């Protein structure tokens, strides 16, 4: 029997020792002698294996030390870069690093002259700018592409299915999300700051005749004002009116509000802030344009002793109507204080005699009495003062098909009615420029402000003026 032990590496096979146990010429009949022989054989094998492992470890250590001596370096030795302070353990890493310091290692192979760049990104930008294959260009904007199919898709999405530009005189259609970029790129004279003037809806000509605004002026506000003056002067037959305050100035169309801020008669007749507003006594109006105070309408609690809430409501409504009639048919003496507001928007401190809620406008008090304290009213208001906020709850069925109600609450009645449009699937608010429809008025206002630089107030005034 022979035992072989090998040393690492396998390519260098070395026989460490061999062992041949003594052989018996004849079969032994004594079992004790066989047991002793097996014990001696096992002990010799274990001792030989320990000696072999120790020798293998010593050989490996000597080979590792010899390889390090041949390299001529240790762990603490590094290769420094001659251009910077970096150090590298291996020379190939240093060679790759030195290429970074070569500022002109990227060369354009398509230029007639030698053109080199320090980074690959600069080379790509140069190639895209001067050697790009995008030979196809959009006929209405600066979009380019190397494939005609992309040009056709861009033209359909942006210029066919898009919305018209809101600037007067521009007939280009663009995508809704690119409208601001189009105005910034092609209409540089129009400021797009955070406090920009909202441009009106564009009209290329008068809807009643063939008149067109002056296109030499690039400002859309001036073009729109010119068109409005034309409609008021020609189609509505309005002549310049004399100022009713007695200053002798003739007012043109659209200049009433500007004149009131600088009218000499108005400035002279405005009393100082220290003077109190004259009270109206004995149901006689000495001044038809004087603001109404709280004492004029409400009075004390002893003066209004009623048997029921309906009587108080009726008397309060009669008092408000009497004030309106006295304002309308009152004396025409020169007023001590001129108000810019109309007759229906008289300011003051108006209080409800039933719930003691106060209002600054008489119209709001009238509306409050009609909604909360009339005989047909079903709403209940708490006498907690003006801080109380009404909650309008939706009683429609849920959209999921369950028998439960929706249960959503809203602060205003208008918001509740807009929410009903969601249940009914109705979109009553439509944008005439891009044909987009909305359930709620607030979402329509956000759309006009974001994409058309206008507001619902301007749109309503435009419809009232032009009918479109």
UniProtKB/Swiss-Prot annotation:
Instruction: Give the Low complexity compositional bias ranges.
Output: 17-28
Q: What is its main location?
A: nucleus
UniProt feature, compositional bias: Acidic residues: 29-39
Is rRNA processing set as a keyword in this record? Answer: no
- Which ranges does the record mark as transmembrane? none
Q: What is this protein called?
A: Putative zinc finger protein F56D1.1
Q: Which UniProt keywords apply?
A: DNA-binding, Metal-binding, Nucleus, Repeat, Zinc, Zinc-finger
PANTHER family linked to this entry: C2H2-TYPE DOMAIN-CONTAINING PROTEIN, KRAB AND ZINC FINGER DOMAIN-CONTAINING
Gene Ontology MF term list: DNA-binding transcription factor activity, RNA polymerase II-specific; sequence-specific DNA binding; zinc ion binding
**Highest taxon listed in the record's lineage:** Eukaryota
Which chain segments does UniProt annotate as zinc-finger regions (C2H2-type)? 79-101, 136-159, 350-373, 392-423, 429-452
**Record keywords: Magnesium included?**
no
One GO BP: regulation of transcription by RNA polymerase II
Q: Which GO CC annotations does the UniProt entry carry? A: nucleus
Outline the segment boundaries, as ranges, of region: Disordered: 17-76
SUPFAM superfamilies membership: beta-beta-alpha zinc fingers (SSF57667)
- Subcellular location field: Nucleus
């Amino acid at each position: 029997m022979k035992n072989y032990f090998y040393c690492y590496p396998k390519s260098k096979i070395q026989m460490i020792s061999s062992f041949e146990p003594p052989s018996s010429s004849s079969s032994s009949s004594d079992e004790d002698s066989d047991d002793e022989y097996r014990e001696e054989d096992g002990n010799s094998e274990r001792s030989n294996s320990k000696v072999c492992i120790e020798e293998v470890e010593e050989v490996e250590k000597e080979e590792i030390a010899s390889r390090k001596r041949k390299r001529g370096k240790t762990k603490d030795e590094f290769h420094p870069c001659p251009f910077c302070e970096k150090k590298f353990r291996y020379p190939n890493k240093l060679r790759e690093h030195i290429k970074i310091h070569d500022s002109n290692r990227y060369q354009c192979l398509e230029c007639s002259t030698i053109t080199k760049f320090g980074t690959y990104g600069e080379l790509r930008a140069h190639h895209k700018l001067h050697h790009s294959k995008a030979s196809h260009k959009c006929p209405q904007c600066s979009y380019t592409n190397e494939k005609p199919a992309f040009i056709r898709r861009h033209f359909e999405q942006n210029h066919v299915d898009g919305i018209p530009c809101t600037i007067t005189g521009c007939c280009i259609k663009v995508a809704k999300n690119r409208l601001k970029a189009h105005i910034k790129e092609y209409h540089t004279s129009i400021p797009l700051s955070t406090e920009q003037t909202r441009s009106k809806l564009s009209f290329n000509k008068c809807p009643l005749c063939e008149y067109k605004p002056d296109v030499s002026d690039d400002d859309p506000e001036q073009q729109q004002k010119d068109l409005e003056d034309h409609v008021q002067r020609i189609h509505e037959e309005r002549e310049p009116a004399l100022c009713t305050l007695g200053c002798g100035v003739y007012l043109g169309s659209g200049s009433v509000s500007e004149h009131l801020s600088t009218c000499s008669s108005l400035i002279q007749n405005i009393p100082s802030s220290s003077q109190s507003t004259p009270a109206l006594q004995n149901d006689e109006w000495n001044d038809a344009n004087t603001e109404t105070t709280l004492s004029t309408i409400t009075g004390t609690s002893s003066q209004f002793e009623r048997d029921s809430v309906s009587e108080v409501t009726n008397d309060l409504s009669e008092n408000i109507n009497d004030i309106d009639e006295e304002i309308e048919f009152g004396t025409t003496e020169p007023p001590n204080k001129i108000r810019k507001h109309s007759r229906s928007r008289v300011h003051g401190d108006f209080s409800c005699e039933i719930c003691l809620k106060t209002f600054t406008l008489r119209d709001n008090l009238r509306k409050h009495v009609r909604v909360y304290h009339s005989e047909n009213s079903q709403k209940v208001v708490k006498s907690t003062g003006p801080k109380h906020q009404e909650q309008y709850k939706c009683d429609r069925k849920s959209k999921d098909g369950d028998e439960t109600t929706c249960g959503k609450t809203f602060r205003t009645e208008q918001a509740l009615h807009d929410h009903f449009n969601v249940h009914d699937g109705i979109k009553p608010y439509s944008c005439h420029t891009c044909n987009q429809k909305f359930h709620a008025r607030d979402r329509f206002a956000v759309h006009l402000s974001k994409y058309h630089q206008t507001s619902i107030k301007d749109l309503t005034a435009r419809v009232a003026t032009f009918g479109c």
